Amino acid sequence: MKTTIVLVLAFSAIAATPAQAQLGGLSDRLKQAQEAKAKVDKFDLRISEADERKLGEEVSQRLCQEFGVYQNKEVARYVALVGRVLAQESSRPGLDWQFIVLDTDGVNAFASPGGFVHITRGALGLVRNEAELAGVLGHEITHITAKHTVRAIQKSKVVSLGASEVGSSGGLAQSVVSRLAEAAYSNIINNKFDRNDEVESDKVGIGLANKAGYAPGALSDVLKRLEDRNKNQEQPNGMFASHPLITDRLENIAKIIKDDKLTASGRVGTRYTKFITFEAKPLSEVPVIAGARGLTGGDSKDSKDAKATEKKAEPKKKGGLLGKVGLTSGSQAQNTQTVASAGARGLGQPDRDAKGGTNPNKVDMTVTAAEVAEFKKGIA
């Protein structure tokens, strides 16, 4: 396993010299600095599949801690079966895929590197049939198979490594994985993937749904419902809040279905409503928390205080949500303060900042290949 290390370059100050000599020395040093920077720009942070898994597991734990895990085993198994049907059609079927239902009324979904897909209880309530669920899960699966979060981290170079931070087996040290997880969590929770990443996830995701027998256009139905849900919101909110605009995505999905001749027609509404017996709450009824979720990995003082006092007072609204791999304008502390202040003014986005449950433990269950094969027979 090879790991390329991003070098952190430091240049000493120029000692006092005669003017002419100093100018010459400055010119030489400037040239050296330019050459060194060009060399550094060629370096990349290599994240192995094992490192990706560790990274994704840590991010998943943070999501479960932040939102809680819905403890209904039948619902958890059902979502996992739909997800596994899609995952086996993907370019990375061998990943140890996990599909987790988060215990929050907010309508959202998150893809964590290495095979961890999360969908909220609120999102399940918004979806109307299995094909729509497949469209959502297929989109999130593609973020993972295409390594969108991993590549965003690599491009941003938010973490610089020293030789001591490479593990004894050649992988990344745990301290580095934790730093990467902080950046990845911010990227995921704030839901601002690159435009091309979103287009790819829509295209490949509906392709996976089609291969499994689900109607690919079902994702468009979810998007339309989301558009109506958020029509009075000033900013993008919750699931699929990233650009491009929903109207553009709808047009693109229709074009993909036509050009790629995607003709599957399975909707599977009856089986869906057998397991998902609840509906999404209107935005006005979704409780939100105070704090700066996403800017500090969900562990800000405001967030902790809100959780500690949420039973004593009505939760305050807050801002927050995705930025590109944790990169923000200004210092993190400044951004945290700004978001918290916005929350104090009553500015918040319910789906994005929804209060979660208190149990972070994942539902203990196993889904076998035979169960997946049998489940797939019901797609019609």
Task: Locate the predicted segments by residue.
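Bacterial N-terminal signal peptides
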Residues: V6-A15
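A Zn2+-metalloprotease active-site environment signal
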Residues: P18-A380
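Positively charged n-region of N-terminal signal peptides that target proteins for export
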Residues: M1-T4
